[in-house]
Regions:
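Nucleotidyltransferase catalytic core that binds NTPs
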Residues: 1-149
């Protein structure tokens, strides 16, 4: 995920995704991907990784190595790393409430490797990073918005 900025919906998604398997590896989109999405990084990719890593239930956070908006190369890297483990028997690619399957590159990769793709983890969109950023912008330009009269 982008986690730009991270919010309660992300935490709920991570909590629910952690129930799908023994280990939860979270892919954090890199700063270039944030820009490709049409946004500006609210925090650096390393800050976002540190925060995600600290959330209960996260076994490991991985920074996306992809140069486009997909995470298919990163997903492949994780699969290659874990699938050689003697105890590995399956993998799930989980997405939050704001992502739906639309024959993405990730879907194709998952199907080719027998990875189960699950969407709408954590229910519908509870909060949006973009709405938080817009609210933050309003407060930045209105010095009195933080005071009640």
């Amino acid at each position: 995920g982008y986690f730009n900025p991270i919010h309660i919906g992300h935490v709920d998604y991570i909590k629910n995704a952690s129930k799908l398997g023994d280990r939860l590896v979270v892919i954090v989109n890199n700063d270039r991907q944030v820009e490709l999405k049409g946004s500006t990084p609210f925090m650096s990719e390393y800050d976002r990784m540190s925060i995600v890593s600290a959330i209960k239930g996260v076994h490991r956070a991985v920074l996306s190595i992809d140069a486009d908006r997909s995470v298919v190369r990163t997903l492949g890297s994780i699969y290659d790393e874990y699938s050689v483990d003697y105890f590995f028997d399956s993998m799930v690619f989980a997405n939050g409430g704001d992502v739906n399957s639309v024959n993405s590159r990730e879907d194709w990769y998952c199907e080719s490797r027998g990875i189960k793709a699950v969407y709408n983890i954590g229910g519908g969109k509870m909060q949006s990073s973009s709405s938080l950023l817009k609210a933050s912008e309003k407060k930045r330009y209105d010095p009195y918005s933080m005071y009640e009269f």
